[in-house]
């Protein structure tokens, strides 16, 4: 069986990507069913036992900026080795709620860690590995903020200011501009039915 595909969902907190992730994966599995392939759904930080432990630390404990980035990439290495690469090798498709673009957006754009440091970590951990497709849920920070305020107790990232998320969004869009062949941008300011219509277009293009 041919190697599987790797798809990532990205966007600032409150953009709505997690709301649509399972729906997208269910539709994708329907398409892949006759081929015998499966859809593996995962997330970052997380995806492995170590990754989930790191997730609790990263989302809830204050720490040095460079420590934060290093922990993100440590969890990613484990995630690649134990989950992503084995699934792709056996022909399954993997859909991850966040991957490396999030680290560039949050630790780079939002927190201001120099891009060259993140690029060095990316090369070390991933080599040339990149997602086959990244679905970027794009929305104005003020809209995302209103959505976040309507849900559970926020973690340390969700509690950041609109200015932080404006920088994070700008870095996401910069990444998308630099790799347009890899990104599909979804206007997530729309209603749920309209967003799903956009995602149907993404699925049709796979």
UniProtKB/Swiss-Prot annotation:
SUPFAM superfamilies attached to this UniProt entry: P-loop containing nucleoside triphosphate hydrolases
GO MF term list: ATP binding; dTMP kinase activity
UniProt GO BP: dTDP biosynthetic process; dTTP biosynthetic process; dUDP biosynthetic process
UniProtKB keywords: ATP-binding, Kinase, Nucleotide biosynthesis, Nucleotide-binding, Transferase
Keyword ATP-binding attributed: yes
Cited InterPro entries: P-loop_NTPase, Thymidylate_kin-like_dom, Thymidylate_kinase
GO cellular component entries: cytosol
Cited Pfam families: Thymidylate_kin
Assigned EC number: 2.7.4.9
Residues that, per the record, bind ATP: 11-18
Recorded catalytic activity of this chain's protein: dTMP + ATP = dTDP + ADP
Family: Belongs to the thymidylate kinase family.
Role of this protein: Phosphorylation of dTMP to form dTDP in both de novo and salvage pathways of dTTP synthesis.
NCBIfam families: DTMP_kinase
PANTHER family, per database record: THYMIDYLATE KINASE, UMP-CMP KINASE 2, MITOCHONDRIAL
The protein's name in its UniProt record: Thymidylate kinase
Organism (species): Burkholderia mallei (strain ATCC 23344)
């Amino acid at each position: 069986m041919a190697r599987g595909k790797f798809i990532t969902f990205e966007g600032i907190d409150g953009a709505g990507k997690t709301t649509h992730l399972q729906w997208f994966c269910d539709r994708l599995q329907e398409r892949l069913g006759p081929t015998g392939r499966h859809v593996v759904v995962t997330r970052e930080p997380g995806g492995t036992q170590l990754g989930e432990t790191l997730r609790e630390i990263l989302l809830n404990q204050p720490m040095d900026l460079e420590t934060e980035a290093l922990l993100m990439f440590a969890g990613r290495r484990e995630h690649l080795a134990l989950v992503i690469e084995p699934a792709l090798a056996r022909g399954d498709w993997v859909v991850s709620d966040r991957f490396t673009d999030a680290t560039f957006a949050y630790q780079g754009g939002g927190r201001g860690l120099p891009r060259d440091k993140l690029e060095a970590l990316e090369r070390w951990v991933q080599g040339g590995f990149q997602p086959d497709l990244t679905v970027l849920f794009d929305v104005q920070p003020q809209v995302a903020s209103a959505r976040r305020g309507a849900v559970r107790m926020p973690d340390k990232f969700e509690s950041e200011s609109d200015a932080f998320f404006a920088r994070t969004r700008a870095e996401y869009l910069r990444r998308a501009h630099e790799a347009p062949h890899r990104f599909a941008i979804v206007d997530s300011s729309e209603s749920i039915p309209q967003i799903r219509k956009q995602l149907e277009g993404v699925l049709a293009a796979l």
